[in-house]
Amino acid sequence: ERQERYMNIAVISTYVDSYIFPPVVRGIERVLSKKGYTTQIAFTGNRVSREQDILNNLIDKDIIDGLIVEPAKSALPNPNLHYYQELKERGIPILFFNSRYPDLELPCVSMNDEQVGKKAVEYLIKNGHRNIGGVFKSDDGQGHLRYKGFLSGMLGAGIKVKDANVVWLDTEDFLDLDQWADYLFRRLESCTGVVCYNDEVAYVLSGLCEKRGIAIPDQLSVVSIDNSDLATLAGVKLTSFPHPMEALGRKAAENMISMIENPYFDGNYLFDSDIIERDSVKVLKQPHK
């Protein structure tokens, strides 16, 4: 355990302009400043090279008491793990949020992504859908966990998952989903419903459907995750599972303080989420009571 206290916590996040980060950082800062900590924030843009620069800098300066970090491309092999090990060996507690690197045994505060993926597909199944597709993010851990839940929901209902109906896209693809439109609709052609990785995907997908004259929910039902402002801005308001956002930030900060005060504290925490029903899902048959 480190003896010297700098009253300084570093926060590393992927995107400054995502709809999730501002409320998360608000939650983090509120809790930390009450305890007398300053927060320094850096952004990776979900790029591993940028993450390397930031970690290097933190190790050189050596003036932090703890690190709260959203990993870059958490589903892919990461060349920066030794920097985290180095910080850990110096007695600096590290807490991940939203996702984690599977190779590092470090705690994480996040949404229960697997459970949410399962609940999302179960909601479509309950409303009579059986040909269900998914659009998931390939380079972030949340995408894999949401897919894992999606699979278990489908298999639990005795429905075979058609791999052709599951589309994987990465961070770079997300920047220009329009260019994937033909491909997306080809893959989802036989589906009556789709689980979207998040509201960003669902929002863009609903816009693409509009352009092609595909009616949501009559021709395609959409369930999304995050319940951000985008869910209500879409042409058809999206049924979505809320991300804990500010509550997640507060929890991460509380757990970080506990980890600084007690090196044996378990900083892991998963947030449950319950669906917010709007207009993007069609009932194909009456749900079983």
Residue ranges: model-predicted function:
Residues Q3, Y123-I132:
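Glycine-rich phosphate/diphosphate-binding loops that line cofactor/substrate pockets in enzymes
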Residues E4-E122, Y183-R186:
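Alpha-helical recognition/docking segments in bacterial nutrient-uptake
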Residues S13-P23, I41-R50, A72-A75, S99, ...:
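Hinge/beta->alpha junction and helix N-cap segments in small-molecule ligand-binding domains
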Residues L32-K35, R90, L155-V161, L188-E189, ...:
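Short helix-capping segments at alpha-helix termini
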Residues I64-D65, H129-N131, T192:
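Short acidic/polar active-site loop segments enriched in Thr and Asp
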Residues N131, V161-N165, I216-S221:
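Short acidic capping loops at alpha-helix termini that bridge into adjacent secondary structure
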Residues D178-K289:
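Flexible loop/turn connectors
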